[in-house]
């Protein structure tokens, strides 16, 4: 079994992640629940865009070990210091960014107040020396003693040759994630499982690594264990704040997938080919976004992007409006691709008031003008085609109504194609229009997700009746599906709806998914 499991994972080859060949050449004529991966609705017909992984850890374990071994190789201490200074200079973020979020941080909140304790979820990040690095609510200074106690618990258990994973008491969960040289702690009074909380802590960890690289992070603490990492992260807290909001509201982070802008395949193909033609020697990824939806992604041959890296790019773009002011140029580490170094991203909007944002990722630090030329070539080519108008029209209506599916009792659903790493879902109906109701529905999906992916007792189906809605979840080797029905729906009608929905997705897959991703 272990041998088979190892064959199913991705491997590092010359610094490039090579995905497992899971795509099947034969697609099913009609969707059925037992579809194998590669033939389900939404499966890519040519090649995958994203890395496939069974867990958050199996793709980075080797990379992180390598980063630890090579943190100091070939670089003097003076070079490290120069690199850190350059990093601080490049990532000196204007204070206006922190005002871009509608849910601004309550940094001045009294940590001894009832309001602070009443938050359903807290996140803390500290160093292994117990130095505070980040807290979602309140100030790090006010919580330094609390974080010291957390580190003492971790150290005490480690001294006994063990690892502390979680504490459950009085309806509260405290989950620990040690990613040397950092310790991340989540405290929750929600119904989230330990695994779901670990997933969120993983995202926070990768967000920090994306700002510094794991190599720099290890070097800092190897030379000074009690270093105050906030000195380097000052001004970037808004990214972590916004990521935590996304974790509560974006189904893609739950499903480990990305959603596409619904667009006729003919128009998407023109956009993709226009982006493919605007290439450059050092260009690795060309990504076109429409708000929080992917329009297309063109990659260098044999280079693959992980969904976590793409979510971090989404978060970077969505956390600030400053990129609308012109052409941005920023360093970014894609931790699932390479934890040791920076890429450099050219970020700009196609038009000042547009939701269409183009991200060109280069391996070269001094490549700004080349990337700017690539954008101009793309715009010159695209603007002459009718597909550009079709794209702008699609952005005006970035989702679709569940009514189009033709299942009266169905209120909402999430469908993920495993082989493509893409998912689709309709807009929220009126009953879930408020932010609170949307977060409640997502929390219900999280509970279903936890049941399907239980570490020791995973389920293939799960049906649940509630006063306000009925829910059905299903997982096969090809897809994951989560459905929300009216409370008047029966179990029989819910299961009958699955095949009907899959047939509808198959019929619409050209519009809802990227079936033929392009490469340079």
Language-model features: locations:
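Intrinsically disordered, Ser/Thr-rich regulatory regions of eukaryotic membrane-trafficking proteins
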Residues: 1-520
């Amino acid at each position: 079994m272990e041998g088979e499991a190892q064959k199913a994972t991705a491997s590092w080859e010359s610094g490039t992640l090579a995905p497992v060949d899971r795509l099947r050449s034969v697609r099913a004529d009609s969707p059925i629940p037992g579809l194998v991966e590669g033939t389900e609705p939404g499966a890519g017909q040519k090649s995958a865009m994203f890395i496939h992984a069974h867990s958050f850890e199996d793709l980075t374990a080797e990379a992180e070990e390598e980063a630890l071994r090579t943190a100091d190789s070939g670089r003097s201490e003076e070079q490290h210091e120069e690199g850190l200074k350059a990093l601080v200079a490049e990532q000196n973020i204007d204070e206006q960014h922190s005002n871009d979020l509608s849910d601004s941080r309550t940094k001045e909140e009294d940590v001894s107040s009832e309001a602070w304790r009443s938050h359903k979820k807290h996140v803390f990040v500290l160093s292994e020396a117990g130095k505070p690095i980040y807290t979602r609510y309140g100030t790090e200074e006010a919580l330094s003693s609390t974080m010291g106690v957390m580190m003492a618990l971790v150290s005490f258990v480690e001294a006994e040759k063990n690892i502390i994973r979680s504490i459950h008491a009085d309806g509260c969960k405290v989950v620990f994630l040690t990613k040397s040289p950092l310790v991340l702690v989540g405290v929750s009074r929600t119904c989230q499982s330990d695994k779901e909380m670990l997933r969120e802590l993983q995202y926070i960890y990768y967000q920090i690594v994306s700002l510094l690289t794991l190599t720099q992070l290890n070097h800092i603490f190897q030379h000074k264990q009690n270093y105050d990492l906030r000195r380097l992260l000052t001004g970037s807290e808004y990214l972590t704040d916004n990521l935590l909001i996304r974790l509560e509201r974006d189904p893609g982070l739950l499903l480990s997938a990305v959603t596409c802008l619904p667009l006729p395949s003919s128009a998407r193909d023109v956009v993709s080919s226009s982006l493919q033609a605007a290439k450059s020697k050092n260009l690795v990824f060309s990504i076109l976004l429409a708000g929080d939806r992917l329009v297309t992604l063109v990659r260098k041959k044999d280079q693959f992007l992980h969904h976590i890296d793409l979510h971090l790019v989404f978060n970077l773009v969505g956390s600030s409006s400053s990129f609308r002011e012109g052409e941005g140029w920023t360093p970014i580490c894609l931790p699932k691709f390479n934890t040791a170094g920076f890429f450099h991203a050219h970020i700009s909007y196609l038009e000042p008031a547009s939701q269409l944002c183009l991200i060109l990722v280069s391996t070269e630090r001094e490549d700004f003008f080349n990337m700017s030329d690539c954008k101009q070539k793309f715009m010159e080519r695209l603007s002459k085609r009718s597909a550009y108008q079709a794209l702008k029209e699609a952005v005006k209506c970035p989702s679709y109504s569940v009514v189009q599916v033709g299942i009266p009792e169905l209120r909402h659903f999430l469908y993920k194609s495993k082989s493509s790493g893409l998912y689709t879902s309709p807009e929220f109906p009126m009953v879930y229009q408020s932010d609170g109701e949307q977060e409640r529905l997502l929390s219900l999906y999280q509970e279903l997700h936890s049941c399907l992916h239980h570490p020791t007792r995973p389920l293939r189906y799960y049906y649940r009746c509630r006063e306000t809605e009925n829910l059905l979840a299903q997982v096969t080797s090809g897809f994951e599906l989560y459905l929300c029905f009216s409370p008047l729906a029966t179990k029989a009608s819910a299961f009958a709806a699955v095949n009907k929905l899959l047939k509808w997705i198959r019929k619409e897959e050209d519009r809802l998914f990227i079936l033929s991703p392009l490469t340079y």
